[in-house]
């Protein structure tokens, strides 16, 4: 971006509704990203987990990446994301000297990475570091220093002591800026003096590749944003005439 003469870059400049309106842009793209949930809501559990607020040391990947590691020697990582993040967090904690257990509802750790041919290497890296791996178990409850699971196959209960806990579940869009401009029901969009669009994880948390694609597409379509109710590609439509 720094090489482009028609692009101005302002890092460390958090904006709110007033500063966006004052800027005077013709088009505004909101790409404020997402944050990891800490309540246990995930693919396998469609509601927050009871007792999770009572755990003494419950962290998210955002906390870990900010340098906030559990002080406990034993840490449990619950991975209901199934991509690379759960494995990365477990490796980092193991490399920092923690005794790590990784539990996932999936059939194997980081199971989605079968699509990217990384699963075998991720599992080997975890085992080489002494990480305990438990698959096919879904989180059911959290206490102050332990976590309860149910086996996906037998429904048998399993309780694990977990002085430290890291939740790798779902991410929530950070869309407060967008809705402050568009209105809670997006009823104010037509009243704005500029075009408004949210893209990337701010719209729907996804992979890095998907976020890059979304930004690239939005830039290409900026001068003529398509109607969201119209499919922007040709479709095959079979027509059968009566005989």
Which role does the model predict for each range below?
Residues 1-38, 60-63, 71-72, 95-185, ...:
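A Rossmann-like FAD-binding core segment of flavoenzymes
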Residues 3, 9, 17-18, 37-96, ...:
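Glycine-rich dinucleotide-binding loop and its adjacent helix/turn
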Residues 78-92, 96, 108-114, 119, ...:
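A conserved FAD-binding loop/helix module that cradles the flavin
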């Amino acid at each position: 971006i720094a090489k482009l003469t028609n692009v101005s870059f302002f890092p460390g400049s958090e904006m709110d509704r007033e500063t966006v309106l004052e800027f005077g842009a013709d088009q505004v793209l909101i790409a404020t990203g997402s944050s990891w949930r800490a309540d246990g809501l995930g693919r396998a559990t469609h509601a927050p987990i009871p007792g999770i607020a009572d755990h003494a040391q419950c962290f998210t990947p955002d906390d870990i990446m900010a340098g906030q590691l559990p002080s406990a020697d034993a840490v449990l990582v619950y991975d209901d994301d199934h991509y690379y993040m759960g494995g990365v967090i477990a490796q980092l904690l193991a490399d920092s000297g923690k005794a790590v257990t990784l539990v996932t509802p999936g059939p194997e750790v980081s199971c989605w990475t079968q699509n990217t041919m990384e699963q075998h290497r991720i599992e080997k890296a975890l085992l080489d570091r002494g990480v305990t791996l438990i698959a096919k178990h879904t989180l059911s409850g959290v206490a102050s220093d332990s976590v309860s699971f149910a086996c996906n196959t037998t429904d048998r209960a399993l309780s694990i002591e977990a002085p430290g806990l890291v939740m790798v579940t779902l991410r929530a869009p950070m869309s407060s800026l967008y809705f402050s401009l568009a209105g809670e029901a997006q009823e104010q969009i037509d009243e704005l003096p500029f075009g408004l669009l949210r893209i990337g994880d701010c719209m729907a948390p996804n992979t890095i590749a998907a976020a890059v694609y979304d930004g690239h597409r939005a830039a290409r379509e900026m001068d003529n944003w398509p109607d969201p109710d119209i499919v922007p590609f040709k479709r095959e439509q079979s027509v059968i005439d009566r005989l």
